């Protein structure tokens, strides 16, 4: 897999590989809500993106990078 290259995704599907702890938490949430695992992930991801629309604020990242001294 090459890093640093981006291209437009051909569709709107995503493959996730979860660690066992995260998977177990997701399964427990699915069981509590009565939704499918896919719908649970969709709702949680959508909620996160609505709550944190600019998680990586580009101006803050730039300021942090400028404040680092060369070693």
UniProtKB/Swiss-Prot annotation:
Compartments where located: Cytoplasm
Keywords: Activator, Conjugation, Cytoplasm, DNA-binding, Plasmid, Transcription, Transcription regulation
GO cellular component: cytoplasm
Molecular function as annotated in GO: DNA binding
Main subcellular location of this protein, as a coarse class: cytoplasm
InterPro entries with a match to the protein in the record: TraY
Entry keyword Repeat: no
Primary role: Conjugative DNA transfer (CDT) is the unidirectional transfer of ssDNA plasmid from a donor to a recipient cell. It is the central mechanism by which antibiotic resistance and virulence factors are propagated in bacterial populations. Part of the relaxosome, which facilitates a site- and strand-specific cut in the origin of transfer by TraI, at the nic site. Relaxosome formation requires binding of IHF and TraY to the oriT region, which then facilitates binding of TraI. Also positively regulates tra gene expression.
The protein's assembly and partners: Part of the relaxosome, a complex composed of plasmid encoded TraI, TraM, TraY and host-encoded IHF bound to the F plasmid origin of transfer (oriT). Interacts with TraM, probably through its C-terminus.
Record family assignment: Belongs to the TraY family.
Protein name: Relaxosome protein TraY
Organism: Escherichia coli
